[in-house]
Amino acid sequence: ATLSQVAYFEQRHPTFRVDLIEASERSDYVDHILSWAADNISSGPIGVSTSVDVKSLKITQGKLGRQGAADLADRILGEVASGLHLLGVRKFVVAGGETSGQVMNALGVKQLAVAGFDELSGGYCHQAGTEPTSFVLKAGAIPKDDFFFIAIERMREADMRG
């Protein structure tokens, strides 16, 4: 489901597709992503995705190992989230349980206010404080292709309600 959701999102918003094999060979790969992000965030929501089709996944796992690929993807997304936060991003939609944990750790999130689940089954969360940050933490296979659009809109609505 996530792969089709990323493809749907990508039709209207810039999306960086992470190449884990390239990332494993470049020490500056996260900086490369953040440079791309800095050039694109002024236009609105952006995406950074490690999701790939089955064929590409097998190639990547063949080179990096299953756990190695997963760990690298989570580490990169955590570091990118931290860098995006430094660039002023305060709304994040994160897909996957392990990735969500990595992003929370990378951002130093210690406490969240959690809203109830709705028909999207997305975990809407907010971190209060001097730099309030909102999250939608997407569990596994939620079948709505427009999930990311709905999640972003829900965070905007929450901001307007205060």
Give the ranges of each region predicted by the language model:
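Active-site catalytic microenvironments in core metabolic enzymes, especially phosphate/sugar-handling
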Residues: 1-162
